[in-house]
Amino acid sequence: NPTTVMNTQGPIRWGKFKIRDYHDYGAKLPVWEVITKSSNIGTARIAQMIGAEEQQKFLTNLGMTDPIKFEMIEASGGKPLLPKKWSELSAMTISYGHGLSATPMHLAVGYAAIANGGLRIQPSLLKGGSGAEPVRVMSTASAANSVKMLRGVVTDGTASMGEVAGYAVAGKTGTADKP
């Protein structure tokens, strides 16, 4: 639910690791602001609520854990780099852009599923498509809420430079530092 309020007080300490935000957003933010402002602490707390197993299942259904089937052999072999053990810490770091590396094709398929009302469609260069049936990976309500939040990232958040007159652009930035 986009209005659920998350604890964004931090940093989150997990053993020798610290999860921080780029800016201090205060002690609490609703989920829609966690996404709009790109709060690492907020997304990590959401991942804790969901749990590592459910997150892994969702990302697998979204097509983010296996190579994407595609007509071009050069584009179809890319396999995301996944954690060896999908732990609670892995789930938290994956939530804000660490812990999982995906190809541009994976990102396109994932974002397209959100834009398509929660239906994952196999990408294709063929005019008639791949012939594969779309797969429901999230409810239409969840997809609509996700589109609204991603649109908010562009209109009110960290991706304001992505706004294009005449288009309803949605997007997501990353504020996590990668060494």
Regions found by a protein language model. Give the residues of each.
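Beta-lactam-recognizing serine transpeptidase/beta-lactamase-like catalytic domain environment
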Residues: 1-179
